């Protein structure tokens, strides 16, 4: 069963590249299917790049993004995510008055770290869930690329509309005198051509 689970997880997450909220829910639904006792997914506001031999600095922008516990799956939009703070750490955000043995997996792709995954699983399951975490990290990388492409498309759409509006204004200015509103030479010539063309068509 587990031999085909990783490709299935990859496909299901890749189908959610247009919607981060759906992506998070799908990730937790997969944790439910794997029968973890509970799972918590924490994400950084922005991925952090760690280079080899650099001093590690504890991130200040880690937030609870989704969870699965007591057969309940939930996810949070960015501005609804609870941050990890000195007063309310990871353990407090995962507290449900039950005893747990969490295995913690860093979610990364290449040199970028995206967050961490906390799963209440048996120790012998660690290698398999490590591979799961690698796939989630890779899918988070694809999600980051997808969001960047969506932003670029929006910017290009705005720029194109701005160019069209400027062309409309320039076209109007080039046809009319700004002070009098009368047709200038170009505008008069174009209007005359249209008038002559319509006269010819009517005679035909």
Residue ranges and their predicted role:
Residues 1-18, 167-170:
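Signal-transmission linkers at sensory-effector interfaces
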Residues 2, 141, 148, 155, ...:
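Signal-transducing coiled-coil linker
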Residues 10-18, 26-36, 196, 200:
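Short regulatory alpha-helical segment in sensory/regulatory domains of signaling proteins that mediates
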Residues 11, 171-190:
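Conserved nucleotide-binding and Mg2+-coordinating catalytic segments in signaling enzymes
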Residues 16-20, 24, 125, 129, ...:
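The cytosolic transmitter module of two-component sensor histidine kinases
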Residues 36-123:
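GAF sensory domains
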Residues 121-158:
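Amphipathic alpha-helical "output/dimerization" segments
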Residues 173, 189-204:
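Active-site-proximal structural segments of metal-dependent nucleotidyl cyclase/transferase enzymes
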């Amino acid at each position: 069963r587990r031999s085909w689970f990783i490709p299935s997880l990859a496909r299901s997450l890749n189908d959610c590249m247009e919607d981060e909220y759906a992506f998070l829910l799908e990730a937790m639904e997969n944790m439910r299917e794997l029968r973890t006792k509970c799972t918590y997914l924490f994400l950084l506001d922005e991925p952090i790049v760690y280079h080899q031999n650099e001093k590690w600095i504890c991130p200040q922008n880690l937030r609870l993004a989704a969870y699965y516990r007591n057969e309940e799956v939930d996810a949070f939009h960015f501005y609804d995510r609870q941050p990890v703070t000195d007063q309310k750490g990871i353990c407090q955000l995962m507290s449900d008055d039950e005893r747990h043995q969490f295995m913690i997996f860093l979610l990364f792709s290449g040199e970028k770290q995206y967050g961490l995954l906390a799963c209440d699983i048996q120790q012998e399951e660690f290698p398999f869930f490590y591979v799961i975490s690698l796939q989630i990290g890779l899918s988070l990388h694809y999600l980051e690329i997808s969001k960047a492409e969506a932003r670029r498309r929006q910017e290009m759409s705005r720029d194109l509309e701005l160019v069209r509006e400027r062309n409309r204004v320039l076209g109007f200015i080039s046809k009319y005198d700004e002070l009098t509103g009368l047709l200038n030479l170009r505008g008069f010539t174009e209007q005359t051509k249209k008038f002559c063309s319509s006269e010819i068509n009517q005679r035909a």
